[in-house]
């Protein structure tokens, strides 16, 4: 049994970036993977306090909130796909808090050798989608995640109103392609390495 983690950064319930994430997770469900999908719109996660003397090297964050569910999912998963709406040409603040909080467990490197993909949705063309995708992938690389593209990079889309993305068959298809690519790489890694982690 293999496991995939989806993190939807949008503060909107059923936002466009979350819809694309669900499409990206479809291939995993079809192949019998176990899926965990965290919606930050339903969670309470505080920003990092930079209290390094309390978390550095301990693999434990002192903040008591819903982030502990995500911490538990990092070592559990074989793959991770993260989606974000674009705010001020970058990652939304809700997702940024999650990415920053990885610092508290960085020494444990729970995502090293996992396979990842990224999705970003903005209101307009050239609205910061590529910057957002790159920010997610840069974070993944710093965690030791093997980043996998969709057709080109991650999946980027333009959608200004709730549910707009459902009218864009091409983007929905691209999200599924991203999911398939992440799945294929993760399965090949598992076949070649077994339970061992990449160096």
What is each residue range found by the language model?
Residues 1-105, 152-199:
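N-terminal beta1-alpha1-beta2 submodule of the flavodoxin-like/Rossmannoid cofactor-binding fold
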Residues 93, 107-153:
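Short, glycine-/small-residue-rich phosphate/pyrophosphate-handling segment
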